Amino acid sequence: MAVTMRQMLEAGVHFGHQTRFWNPKMAPFIFGHRNKIHIINLEKTLPMFTDAQKYVRQLAANRGTILFVGTKRQSRDTIAQEAQRAGMPFVNARWLGGMMTNFKTLKVSIKRLKDMEAAVEAGELEKMSKKEALLFEREIAKLQKSIGGVKDMGGIPDAIFVVDVGYHKIAVTEANKLGVPVIAVVDTNHSPEGVDYVIPGNDDSSKAVALYAEGVADAILEGRANAVNEVVQAARGDDEYVEENA
């Protein structure tokens, strides 16, 4: 579903940061200021968000993986919820340095988590002493919190979707190093450099974050549905061709 200007206004997407904290590189996307707060030009944001959705749609249609990143308190739950709805990996607790640039190490931790989860399923906890079980539960909880959202990510993602580039500077830097496209919400106090698909907007409002994350998840689901429809249509076309030549 396409996001409208009205939805953006209602979610407060246009509210930037205090003028004294601004990044001059965001000047092209700023409409003006009110009460020492920068106002983002939604006439720029809307088409840029639409472009980002279009890219996401195409990537999803080609079975691409998009990693959702949002670890701030106001975005944590939404990021997990929308990524799961779209069947995509996510990081919503803390970005561990090297999550992409040192994927081999991450794979070791993922294997450990999966082995531990399998042990729980097999009833191994019941065979442990109280102390062993407690330490085991603590470790599995820690792993689930830090890497649970990426445990089914088979490799480096095809793109990352980030809410707040300043807060997730390491994630953006890692993506840039590997040539992984970055789709990101950039507020008036940060630089849009290193971002392939810039979404100029408020990165603090939970309503705004929900709007972006839902929009990206919707685009992923639409892209997948379109790909399935194309396969069905192609199969029908082949059937008709066979009948005509029978």
Swiss-Prot record:
Classification via CDD domains: RPS2
InterPro entries on file: Ribosomal_uS2, Ribosomal_uS2_bac/mit/plastid, Ribosomal_uS2_CS, Ribosomal_uS2_flav_dom_sf
One cellular component term from this protein's GO annotations in UniProt: cytosolic small ribosomal subunit
Domain of life: Bacteria
GO MF annotations, alphabetized: structural constituent of ribosome
PROSITE patterns referenced in this protein's UniProt entry, alphabetically: RIBOSOMAL_S2_1 (PS00962)
Keywords noted in UniProt: Ribonucleoprotein, Ribosomal protein
Tagged with keyword Iron-sulfur: no
GO biological process: translation
Gene3D superfamilies: Glucose-6-phosphate isomerase like protein, domain 1, Helix hairpin bin
UniProt KW Ribosomal protein keyword: yes
Pfam families: Ribosomal_S2 (PF00318)
PANTHER family: 30S RIBOSOMAL PROTEIN S2 PROKARYOTIC AND ORGANELLAR (PTHR12534), SMALL RIBOSOMAL SUBUNIT PROTEIN US2M (PTHR12534:SF0)
Family: Belongs to the universal ribosomal protein uS2 family.
NCBIfam families the record matches: rpsB_bact
Protein name (database record): Small ribosomal subunit protein uS2
Organism: Burkholderia ambifaria (strain MC40-6)
